[in-house]
A protein has these predicted regions:
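Intrinsically disordered, glycine/charged-rich N-terminal periplasmic/extracytoplasmic linker segments
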Residues: 2-4, 22-26
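Bacterial N-terminal signal peptides that target proteins for export
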Residues: 2-14
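Exposed acidic/polar residues on beta-strands and adjacent loops within beta-sheet cores, strongest
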Residues: 26-183
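Residues in flexible loops and secondary-structure boundaries
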Residues: 9, 22-23, 113
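A general, composition-driven signal for non-globular sequence regions
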Residues: 3, 19, 84-86
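Bacterial N-terminal signal peptides
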Residues: 12-22
């Protein structure tokens, strides 16, 4: 096959682009959100999630999600995740994702449905190893505006879900279906 000088340049550009695409795919992670800030318009202001990489190597990938509400007065409030609304002193200031062996094992998604804002978390129990069928559990929290005696904003639990090993759910599918069913 005979190629011209410009044809060689085009071929080199195509091969370089393909190689960069393969490299980018190899380092991509499939969490719902990437490192950085994501914002949603919510009742009472804006919800901001800041995602930062905790650890990143060829096998394991963690992201740390922290949530803030920018109120209508422009004040920025940290929005913790509480496991029991009656015990607001039992809280987490962040949520960590986990991607192991190329599979998401723990992740979360934010869903804004009308005046309500939800955080849905999902975890796959990988006791039999990565990329194998396992039970997936979900937990749904609603963003609540507190008063002076509480957190100004916080995520309170409203529901739990479970998908059996036989259903062979992924974390992504459990998150998508749970978020879609919210009202």
């Amino acid at each position: 096959m005979k190629t011209t000088k410009s044809g060689s340049r085009v071929m080199a550009a195509v091969l370089t682009a393909a190689a960069l695409g393969v490299l980018a795919q190899g380092t991509a992670h499939a969490e719902q959100y990437q490192s950085g800030a994501t914002r949603w318009d919510i009742k009472g202001g804006k919800l901001m999630m800041v995602a930062g990489v905790l650890d990143d190597n060829s096998r394991l990938h963690y992201l740390n999600y922290a949530f803030y509400v920018q109120a209508s007065d422009n004040a920025l409030y940290l929005a913790p995740i509480v496991d029991d609304p009656k015990k607001l002193n039992d809280y987490r200031l962040n949520f960590s994702t986990f991607n192991g062996g190329g599979e998401i094992l723990t992740d979360a998604v934010v869903a804004v449905k009308g005046a309500s804002t939800y955080l849905v978390t999902a975890h796959k129990d990988a006791v039999h190893g990565y990329n194998r069928p396992a039970a997936v559990t979900t937990r749904t929290y609603r963003l609540v505006e507190g008063d002076e005696a509480q957190w100004r904003w916080y995520f309170a639990p409203v529901a739990q879900g479970a998908y059996s090993e036989q259903q062979n759910y992924t974390v992504e599918r459990a998150l998508a279906e749970t978020a879609k069913a919210l009202h």
